[in-house]
């Protein structure tokens, strides 16, 4: 056998071995793919779709929801009965082809199964999502229905428990509840007939009406309590109190109180009748108006009761106060009469006393009897209170005026005594000032000083004349005494000024001798100042003249002399 043939045989054997090995590898790989597809199929088939379908089926869907459920359920049935069976057949065919080394057809079957599984997976996902949506929607709808029914049941229970608190509105409330029941029945009918949209609208209305009626029933008892309990009780209390006050001789500014009671009762009945319309805002407004009218009656009675207490108190005060004021007036009249014999008084005191008499007589004639028998009067106590209050204020004003008059007259004698004492002092001071001036040995007395001196003397004489009269005008005495006091003080100050200017002028004239021989200005001022001093007796002008001249040659000299004089100045010894 030739070597070439041997090589050919060896090559063929090698090719066969390689082909076998390749076939084994491909077969093994396909087995793995087929096993994976089988596991994937089992996993999809094992999903709890049946349980989810049964769960949704138990919800007893109706209408469009039930139709949708049937479609998805049928799709699942088709998958389980047809698609999965077809996939199983293709998997079996792929296994057979792979075992017989028909790899191309086996690969085709594997790809086909994989595509089918992808579609099945998408379908199952869609089915489960649809079932979830149906379940969620149904649960929501069920919750809404349950919530609405719960609200209605609570409303029923509340109305039943508080039936006695709704008064005349009970019939209308029952009517409204029947309407709500009819809406629930309509909802059930529409939902069962497959019209979920309209059914939902009806359910919304039923729920809204339930909530609205619930809110109304919560507010009605308070309104009814006012109309059936509070207002009647208050009116009974008012009428009882009114009768008792009449028995106690109370009178009122209003004469139609009984009619007001009747009008309020009619308003209560009318509001109770109108309440059946469930117009709560109007009912509350009317209740507020009724309460205001009741409160106004309470205020009227309370005002008269309070006025009675004040009148009872003031009726005891006024007679004593009046007697006190009359006594004060008599004392004032006696005191003024006594003082009038010696003094000329101001007309105001007499006029005031007359005005006091008039006020006191008016109270005595018109009010005293009312105060002493106030509980027998046929006037409201509030009016009596005003009368007594005004009278007590008048008495207080009279008393204050009496105190003012007393203060004005009580010091008259003291004023006279002080004026006489001051006059004696002032006359003495006038003589001392005269002696003080005489001791100065002045060349002459300035005319303005003489004028002031004689004016002061005249004012003292006027005060002396007034105090010497048979009846003293005390106002004139007070005025003249004040004038005399000011005049003496002014004369004393002027005396010091005249003496100071005269003394300082003499000193400065002597001091100027050291400058006269060589200062022509000083010499001229000296001559002028000397004339003013000795001839004109104008000591102020003489001082100004010489001091000005010396200041030009020796600044500060005048101040030095003035300071020295003030330290040694002799005072007038009064």
From Swiss-Prot:
Keywords: Cell cycle, Cell division, Cell membrane, Coiled coil, Membrane, Septation, Transmembrane, Transmembrane helix. Its main location: membrane. GO terms for cellular component: plasma membrane; septin ring. It is a single-pass membrane protein. It holds the Pfam family EzrA. The keyword Signal does not apply. Residues 27-574 are cytoplasmic. The chain crosses the membrane at residues 8-26. Residues 102-131, 161-190, 276-379, 459-493 form a coiled coil. It is found in: Cell membrane. Belongs to the EzrA family. Negative regulator of FtsZ ring formation; modulates the frequency and position of FtsZ ring formation. Inhibits FtsZ ring formation at polar sites. Interacts either with FtsZ or with one of its binding partners to promote depolymerization. NCBIfam families: PRK04778.1-1 (NF003407), PRK04778.1-4 (NF003410). This is Septation ring formation regulator EzrA. It comes from Streptococcus equi subsp. zooepidemicus (strain MGCS10565). The gene is ezrA.
């Amino acid at each position: 056998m030739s070597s070439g043939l041997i090589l050919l045989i060896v090559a063929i054997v090698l090719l066969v071995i390689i082909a076998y090995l390749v076939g084994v590898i491909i077969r093994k790989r396909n087995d793995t793919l087929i096993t994976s597809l089988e596991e994937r199929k089992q996993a999809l088939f094992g999903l709890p779709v049946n349980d989810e379908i049964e769960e949704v089926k138990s919800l007893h869907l109706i209408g469009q929801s039930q139709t949708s459920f049937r479609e998805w359920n049928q799709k699942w049935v088709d998958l389980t009965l047809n698609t999965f069976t077809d996939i199983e057949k293709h998997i079996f065919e792929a296994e057979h082809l792979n075992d017989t080394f028909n790899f191309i057809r086996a690969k085709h079957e594997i790809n086909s199964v994989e595509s089918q599984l992808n579609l099945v997976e998408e379908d199952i996902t869609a089915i489960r999502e649809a079932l979830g949506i149906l379940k969620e929607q149904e649960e929501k709808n069920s919750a809404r229905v349950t919530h609405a029914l719960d609200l209605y049941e609570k409303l029923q229970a509340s109305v039943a428990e508080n039936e006695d608190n709704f008064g005349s509105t009970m019939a209308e409330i029952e009517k409204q509840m029947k309407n709500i029941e009819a809406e629930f029945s309509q909802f059930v009918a529409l939902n069962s007939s497959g019209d979920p949209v309209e059914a939902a609208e009806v359910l919304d209305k039923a729920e809204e009406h339930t909530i609205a009626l619930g809110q109304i029933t919560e507010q009605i008892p308070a309104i009814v309590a006012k109309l059936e309990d509070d207002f009647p009780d208050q009116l009974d209390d008012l009428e009882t109190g009114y009768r008792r006050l009449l028995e106690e001789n109370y009178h009122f500014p209003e004469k139609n109180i009984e009619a007001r009671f009747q009008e309020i009762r009619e308003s209560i009945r009318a509001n109770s009748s109108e309440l059946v319309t469930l117009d709560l805002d109007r009912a509350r407004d009317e209740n507020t108006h009724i309460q205001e009218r009741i409160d106004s009656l309470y205020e009227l009675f309370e005002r008269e009761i309070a006025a009675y207490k004040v009148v009872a108190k003031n009726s005891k005060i006024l007679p004593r106060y009046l007697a006190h004021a009359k006594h004060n007036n008599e004392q004032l009249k006696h005191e003024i009469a006594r003082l009038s014999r010696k003094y000329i008084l101001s007309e105001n005191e007499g006029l005031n006393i007359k005005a006091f008499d008039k006020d006191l007589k008016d109270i005595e004639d018109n009010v005293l009897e009312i105060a002493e028998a106030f509980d027998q009067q046929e006037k409201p106590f509030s009016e009596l209170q005003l009368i007594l209050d005004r009278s007590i204020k008048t008495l207080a004003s009279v008393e204050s005026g009496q105190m003012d008059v007393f203060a004005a007259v009580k010091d008259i004698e003291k004023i006279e005594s002080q004026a006489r004492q001051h006059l004696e002092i002032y006359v003495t001071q006038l003589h001392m000032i005269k002696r003080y001036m005489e001791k100065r040995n002045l060349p002459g007395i300035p005319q303005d000083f003489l004028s002031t001196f004689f004016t002061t003397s005249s004012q003292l004489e006027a005060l002396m004349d007034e105090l010497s009269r048979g009846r003293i005008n005390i106002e004139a005495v007070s005025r003249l005494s004040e004038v005399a006091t000011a005049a003496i003080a002014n004369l004393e100050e002027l005396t010091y000024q005249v003496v100071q200017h005269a003394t300082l002028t003499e000193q400065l004239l002597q001091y100027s001798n050291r400058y006269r021989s060589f200062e022509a200005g000083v010499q001229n001022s000296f001559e002028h100042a000397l004339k003013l001093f000795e001839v004109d007796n104008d000591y102020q002008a003489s001082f100004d003249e010489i001091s000005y001249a010396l200041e030009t040659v020796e600044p500060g000299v005048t101040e030095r002399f003035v300071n020295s004089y003030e330290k040694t100045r002799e005072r007038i010894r009064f």
